[in-house]
Amino acid sequence: SGERPWKCCDLQTCTKSIPAFCRCRDLLEQCSDACKECGKVRDSDPPRYICQDVYRGIPAPMCHEHQ
C-alpha cells in the first residue's frame, strides 16, 4: 500500500472494505511529496490543490478537531 499521500485529512471518504480505499478532498496550499496526482482547483485564488490519489490502508486522522 505504501506511504499515505496525506498525513491527516478532514474531508476523507473511505470504503467499508478492509483494507479501506480512501480519498481526501481537502483543499491544500500544496500537495505533499508523497502525493502522485495533484490537481489544481479551477478558479481558486490563491491557488489550492487536491491530492487525487486513492490510498489503500488505515484512514488518516483528522487535521482539525471539531469543537
UniProtKB/Swiss-Prot annotation:
Gene3D superfamilies: Cysteine Protease (Bromelain) Inhibitor, subunit H
Cross-referenced PROSITE patterns: BOWMAN_BIRK
SUPFAM superfamilies for the chain: Bowman-Birk inhibitor, BBI
Entry annotated with the keyword Disulfide bond: yes
Annotated GO CC locations: extracellular region
Cystine pairings recorded for this chain: C8-C63, C9-C24, C14-C22, C31-C38, C35-C51
Swiss-Prot/TrEMBL site (Reactive bond for trypsin) positions: K16, S17
Coiled-coil blocks: none
Record InterPro entries: Bowman-Birk_prot_inh (IPR035995), Prot_inh_BBI (IPR000877)
Pfam families in the cross-refs: Bowman-Birk_leg (PF00228)
Molecular function per GO: serine-type endopeptidase inhibitor activity
Record's keyword terms, sorted: Disulfide bond, Protease inhibitor, Serine protease inhibitor
Similarity annotation: Belongs to the Bowman-Birk serine protease inhibitor family.
Protein's UniProt name: Bowman-Birk type major trypsin inhibitor
